[in-house]
Amino acid sequence: MMNGFSIANVQGYEIIDSRGNLTVRARVTLESGIRATGDAPSGASKGTREAVELRDKDGSVKGAVDSINYYISPALMGLDVREQGKIDRIMIELDGTENKSRLGANATIATSIAVAKTASISMGLEPFMYIGGARTHTLPVPLLNILNGGLHAGNMLKIQEFMVIPVKFDTLKEALIASTKIYKTLKSLVTERYGKIYTALGDEGGISPPLSVTEDALKLVHEAIKRSGMEGRVFMGMDAAASDFYNPEKGVYEIDNTSKSPDEMIEFYVDIASRYPLLYLEDPFEENDFSRYSELQSRIKNVIVTGDDLFTTNVRYLRKGIEMKSARGVIVKANQIGTLTETIQFFDLAKDNSIKTVVSHRSGETEDSFIADLAVGLNSDFIKTGAPSRGERTSKYNRLLEIENEFGLEYLGRRL
């Protein structure tokens, strides 16, 4: 029976992301006329176990758009938009593959997000309230990627992200103001040493100076923290994205103009953690090396070793990581698995096992701020959404500030 919550139509179409690539937008319209959209982000550094992003040979996403218009829309017509789990299960069954390779995870996640946003509007709820239900909501700590390397930049750094983490602050606003001060200080440092031309931004809004050695990047970020007067309040983080510089034929990591064995990489990270205020380390090894993750985490207990490519937002791999005690943290990327329902199942499994959670963007983003609501709705410990620059990044931070201003939620920084 049709009612005001019934889905009348789902339309897919192509839009442009922050890297100038085409991506998928889905728009869900209800019989009542209420409608909302969801966008599919896209990563540059991808785990091999991620759900499949359908992309045509010419770079378009027409195949994924067709999946929405010719398969997903008819299957969802007439369903109650509030039944997120049922809708996501229908898309999973309609796809029929383990990795969303028939419909495309970019088609299913765009639709899943659009369904959630439309449902929240129809119920008169903020998206984070709709997602989280009765959970007590808090504001996550941002991991701000202020210096870019790896596949996100045009320099020779192998480590992909160098982050600042504003912990010892009472509000998110204070934390972000401190972070923007550090970001501007870093820009000034790079200008002083290399010239203004080298303050060009990477894919995620971070600065990309002409560096090739990890230590030089760490020194720059640490000096920016100290010059800003934030030492002891703001910590450091890295996303190595180590699968991208691992040579499987030789079994070595090609970094800093040399080759390191997996055991040498452990000592490399242990040394960094002993000399810098390192709180967070993501993807330190290639995506299949669960045992080295475990060994490193046991060596640097105060650092949150975090798996992204290791787990790819998939409960099967997270269960393995839990069994092997591979990591204290997990990245949560909805497009890696393809529906919000599966994303939340992964998130809850991590939380149930006292693992820190990081709701994350991708390097190819849009201005859609949905992941800010997702992070707040799920009570994520952290959110990762780039530097405090570029509109597709600041839209998420500004949504968090809007939530803080309107609802007065607690900032998690001092609880970590």
Swiss-Prot record:
Give the residues the record marks as binding (2R)-2-phosphoglycerate: Q160, K333, R362, S363, K384
Pathway noted in the entry: Carbohydrate degradation; glycolysis; pyruvate from D-glyceraldehyde 3-phosphate: step 4/5
Q: Which GO terms describe its biological process?
A: glycolytic process
Named cofactor requirement(s): Mg(2+)
Report the Gene3D superfamilies cross-referenced here. Answer: Enolase-like C-terminal domain, Enolase-like, N-terminal domain
Q: Which domain of life is it from?
A: Archaea
Annotated function: Catalyzes the reversible conversion of 2-phosphoglycerate (2-PG) into phosphoenolpyruvate (PEP). It is essential for the degradation of carbohydrates via glycolysis.
Q: What is this protein called?
A: Enolase
Its source organism is: Metallosphaera sedula (strain ATCC 51363 / DSM 5348 / JCM 9185 / NBRC 15509 / TH2)
